[in-house]
A protein has these predicted regions:
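A short glycine-rich, Lys/Arg-flanked "PGG" loop and its adjoining helix->strand segment in the class I
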Residues: 38, 118-132
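Class I S-adenosyl-L-methionine
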Residues: 147-190
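Conserved beta-strand signature within the Rossmann-like core of class I S-adenosyl-L-methionine
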Residues: 27, 129-140
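Glycine-centered, small-residue-biased loops immediately flanking beta-strands
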Residues: 21, 45, 134
Length: 190
């Protein structure tokens, strides 16, 4: 049985993120990962969740409210490249995990999507804020215009990281369909 990339990402995050930790959902979308992270960090942890689009914030706010998790999350309507502008001073260097879903908000305007430049800026920022051990998970959806280019840029960037400080894993499912999503895991081991 094949495990979905989302499940693989969640398994990796679950093995790293503990109650009381700090996490980032860099692309909140419809709030599924934000909710997942909020459950893991518990009442004493915190999640910073980013998206540019108001419908994403509304959907995520409702999902968190319905699950009694809203108080654990800071919803931020801004680009994920601005993470450092919103992080509380006492959370710097304490981010245990961050999640990205690269692409566009399902069911919305497909012209509004993540871009390589801002994604790489966010990743570089997160590396400086990440705890050790720490984990960054990215699922790159490649079936839309620009999707494969962004995935390739992120993989190229990840493969340049110091092997003494980071362990990089890339999962690309055997072509069950054209342009499958790709999972990139970056683990801080410094």
């Amino acid at each position: 049985m094949t495990i979905s990339l989302v499940k693989q990402a969640h398994n990796a995050i679950s093995s790293c993120l503990l109650a009381g930790d700090i996490a980032v959902d860099a692309t909140m979308g419809n709030g599924f990962d934000t909710c997942f992270l909020a459950k893991l960090v518990g009442e004493k942890g915190a999640v910073y969740s980013f998206d540019l689009q108001q419908p994403a914030l509304e959907a995520t706010r409702q999902r968190l409210h319905d699950n009694g998790l809203l108080q654990r999350v800071r919803l931020i309507q801004d680009n994920h490249s601005q993470i450092s502008s919103y992080l509380a001073a006492d959370h710097i260097g304490l981010i245990r995990c961050a999640m990205f879903n690269l692409g566009y908000l399902p069911g919305s305007d497909k012209t509004i999507q993540t871009e390589p430049a801002s994604t790489l800026e966010a990743l570089n920022t997160l590396l400086s804020l990440l705890a050790s051990p720490g984990l960054i998970s990215l699922i790159a959806y490649t079936g839309h215009q620009g999707g494969q280019h962004e995935a390739d840029k992120v993989k190229e960037w990840a493969q340049q990281l110091s092997k003494k400080e980071y362990r990089v894993s890339i999962q690309i499912p055997q072509a069950v369909k054209q342009s499958p999503p790709e999972l990139i895991l970056i683990e801080s081991i410094k």
